[in-house]
């Protein structure tokens, strides 16, 4: 009677849960299963044949993968060596770990737990009890999101007798009440089609310049974009009668080089200057050496292409400060350069 009630409860739950469609896998799900098991008894037991077990289980998913399961089954068709019928029951508590994800068709599992077996001969008072430590595993195959079939095998170690028995099993079951499910990918949004008479990429209903010529870059309003001009200037100072670039000027030269690398279409002219001390011809040559020294730093130190850098000397012809004072002459001993480009 117990067995009939157990199987009836399992089958009834499967039918009811499937009918209402309130099934789900994953964390929080409840699992109901009916199963059949073949018990391969150890030779140390005084049994003539192996046993058939039928039962059911109920499980609860603590996470999407970890399930705690309570099972009950009854022993049938077992005879002792003297031909007597053997009857008994098993109660088991196992933890299962499932692989793959909730909603996948195949979810293999491994299990571990303990069971208590009470078994004895018909017509005799008293039964023998044994405690088992169990490990097992197998696959669950889902026919729908929640209705599945299972096959597995357990190794059952009899703690009381020190023997190991094997128990293959099959079952069918359902999961319901969980919260995790395969998330279907959202359909790609359909791009809105709008009229664009001048083909500038801006819809006519917001285009403030509807007749823009072809191949003209436009802003968000559909009007020709105004290019922003960006500029970098260089001003390198030199000691009297020297054309050696001082270490404290390398940072400014690098800034110019970085700008030219960012805008590879740019070129620059490096202009050398001197103060008024000395002959004009000497100062002209000195200014050219200064300009060339800065060019070499740009090219050799910072990798600017030589074809993009011109150098020219102006001698003392373009002062920016008073050459009558030492401070003014220090300002005039310089190299200047300027680069400008349209902002990206």
UniProtKB/Swiss-Prot annotation:
<dbReference type="InterPro" id="IPR036737">
    <property type="entry name" value="OmpA-like_sf"/>
</dbReference>
<dbReference type="InterPro" id="IPR006665">
    <property type="entry name" value="OmpA-like"/>
</dbReference>
<dbReference type="Pfam" id="PF00691">
    <property type="entry name" value="OmpA"/>
</dbReference>
<keyword id="KW-0732">Signal</keyword>
<keyword id="KW-0812">Transmembrane</keyword>
<dbReference type="InterPro" id="IPR006690">
    <property type="entry name" value="OMPA-like_CS"/>
</dbReference>
<feature type="signal peptide">
    <location>
        <begin position="1"/>
        <end position="24"/>
    </location>
</feature>
<dbReference type="GO" id="GO:0008360">
    <property type="term" value="P:regulation of cell shape"/>
</dbReference>
<keyword id="KW-0133">Cell shape</keyword>
<dbReference type="InterPro" id="IPR008722">
    <property type="entry name" value="OprF_membrane_N"/>
</dbReference>
<dbReference type="GO" id="GO:0015288">
    <property type="term" value="F:porin activity"/>
</dbReference>
<protein>
    <recommendedName>
        <fullName>Outer membrane porin F</fullName>
    </recommendedName>
</protein>
<dbReference type="InterPro" id="IPR011250">
    <property type="entry name" value="OMP/PagP_b-brl"/>
</dbReference>
<comment type="function">
    <text>Has porin activity, forming small water-filled channels. Also has a structural role in determining cell shape and ability to grow in low-osmolarity medium.</text>
</comment>
<dbReference type="InterPro" id="IPR028974">
    <property type="entry name" value="TSP_type-3_rpt"/>
</dbReference>
<dbReference type="GO" id="GO:0009279">
    <property type="term" value="C:cell outer membrane"/>
</dbReference>
<dbReference type="InterPro" id="IPR006664">
    <property type="entry name" value="OMP_bac"/>
</dbReference>
<keyword id="KW-0406">Ion transport</keyword>
<dbReference type="InterPro" id="IPR050330">
    <property type="entry name" value="Bact_OuterMem_StrucFunc"/>
</dbReference>
<keyword id="KW-1134">Transmembrane beta strand</keyword>
<dbReference type="GO" id="GO:0006811">
    <property type="term" value="P:monoatomic ion transport"/>
</dbReference>
<dbReference type="Pfam" id="PF05736">
    <property type="entry name" value="OprF"/>
</dbReference>
<comment type="similarity">
    <text>Belongs to the outer membrane OOP (TC 1.B.6) superfamily.</text>
</comment>
<dbReference type="GO" id="GO:0046930">
    <property type="term" value="C:pore complex"/>
</dbReference>
<keyword id="KW-0813">Transport</keyword>
<keyword id="KW-0472">Membrane</keyword>
<dbReference type="GO" id="GO:0005509">
    <property type="term" value="F:calcium ion binding"/>
</dbReference>
<feature type="domain" description="OmpA-like">
    <location>
        <begin position="225"/>
        <end position="343"/>
    </location>
</feature>
<keyword id="KW-1015">Disulfide bond</keyword>
<keyword id="KW-0626">Porin</keyword>
<keyword id="KW-0998">Cell outer membrane</keyword>
